[in-house]
Amino acid sequence: MAESILDRTINRFWYKLGDDCLSESQFDLMIRLMEESLDGDQIIDLTSLPSDNLQVEQVMTTTEDSISEEESEFLLAIGETSEEESDSGEEPEFEQVRMDRTGGTEIPKEEDGGEPSRYNERKRKTTEDRYFPTQPKTIPGQKQTTMGMLNIDCQANRRTLIDDWAAEIGLIVKTNREDYLDPETILLLMEHKTSGIAKELIRNTRWNRTTGDIIEQVIDAMYTMFLGLNYSDNKVAEKIEEQEKAKIRMTKLQLCDICYLEEFTCDYEKNMYKTELADFPGYINQYLSKIPIIGEKALTRFRHEANGTSIYSLGFAAKIVKEELSKICDLTKKQKKLKKFNKKCCSIGEASVEYGCKKTSKKKYHKRYKKKYKAYKPYKKKKKFRSGKYFKPKEKKGSKQKYCPKGKKDCRCWICNIEGHYANECPNRQSSEKAHILQQAEKLGLQPIEEPYEGVQEVFILEYKEEEEETSTEEDDGSSTSEDSDSESD
């Protein structure tokens, strides 16, 4: 109980003061002040502490009014135990309590198997315990090899790795000639400076140790086995073939956008140095002619300014190109500034020489700017799924009965002139042609007879005897006249 009350009071004190804001000197001063406050009834003014972040609102006093009931009971219990120990003649054993900056006391560790103390649960985190993210020194997944070791397993830039490794091996051998006089020691060095398939090649190959340089033999074998270049048998032919490929690539290279000047120059320079040094001036002129906009001006400057060794320098030509490019950039900046220049200020320098001349005015077109916001905001409503909207069953269309205007079937059929049905339901209806004829007859005021005839031509036959006689006599006369004409012709 004594330890819990003491821990509580000290932790409350450190929490109010703010232990993170104290320096080492302030921390030592605080410990000394607390030790003095425990001795007697001393009044301590904590506002004298040299700290801007430390704010003390009260003056601490160790009077009886500031002691709580639990603390007073604790002090009485300590007094009783001290009196009993003094009566018994034994000296009391005081437990040393050390204060730290973490805001609590250092409690002795419990024995194994004991329950965890509450102190560890209430322990405040210090600056050392906090997590500060730091950038890793190496990129995760990137294989880091030691300096001078050659490992070309599944590597894309094998030629660069082999050239760097060969240069380092040659430097070691030439600077330590006394140690590497024997080819066996050189092979041993090369074997220990390689790993993977390169090491297996050096170990399993029978090298000619009597004639030739052993380093050149190993490098030529690596070029043949790992790069596919036949350097061991015909090195001259391989170099000539590389030069031809470089020349073809330089002629095919094109620069369409001036912003890619650095990449174009790098590729052209890498291929140019594979050719002979005497051919450099011609390739430099070709390089300048491929550059758009400023290539012609840069070429004329290169021919006038280049002299001596600068004729073979592609870097000198690239420098001239960059200077011309910067001039054009400055000119464009000036043109942008001239657009904002006020023409009314031109009369300050010199008087105008134009009198009565009409100024050509150009029509101004107002530029339409696109609105940044919509004139209306569409209201989006969540649509519910309705099965009847898309899957509505088809209606069964049946034969609907037509009614007369009065609501009864008392109309008269105009084909048979009988009430009770329509003309389309008439049993005497035979064809649409007959119905058309009946319509025409009805317009003329004619009515159908009770007993209809079968034929179409026999429906409206008019029987007049006088007309028949006249027609018959006319026919007879016509026949006689025709006979007379025939006889006369004979």
UniProtKB/Swiss-Prot annotation:
Basic and acidic residues compositional bias, start-end:
95-111
What is the name of the protein in this document? Capsid protein
User: According to the UniProt entry, which residue ranges have a biased composition of type Acidic residues?
Assistant: 81-94, 465-490
List, alphabetically, the PROSITE patterns matched.
Answer: ZF_CCHC
The function of this protein is: Self assembles to form an icosahedral capsid, about 50 nm in diameter, nm, composed of 420 subunits of the viral capsid protein. The capsid encapsulates the genomic dsDNA. Following virus entry into host cell, provides nuclear import of the viral genome. Virus particles do not enter the nucleus, but dock at the nuclear membrane through the interaction with host importins.
Q: Which family does it belong to?
A: Belongs to the caulimoviridae capsid protein family.
Task: Write down a Pfam family by its short name.
Answer: Caulimovir_coat_dom
Motif Nuclear localization signal, which positions? 122-125
What is the originating organism of this protein? Cauliflower mosaic virus (strain D/H) (CaMV)
Q: Does the keyword Oxidoreductase apply?
A: no
Which SMART domains does this UniProt record tie to the protein?
ZnF_C2HC
Q: What subcellular compartments does it reside in?
A: Virion; Host nucleus
Which InterPro entries does the protein's record reference? Caulimo_coat, Znf_CCHC, Znf_CCHC_sf
Q: Region annotation Disordered: residue ranges?
A: 79-143, 464-490
Alphabetical GO CC annotations of the entry are: host cell; host cell nucleus; T=7 icosahedral viral capsid
Q: Which GO terms describe its biological process?
A: symbiont entry into host cell; viral penetration into host nucleus
Any GO molecular function: structural molecule activity
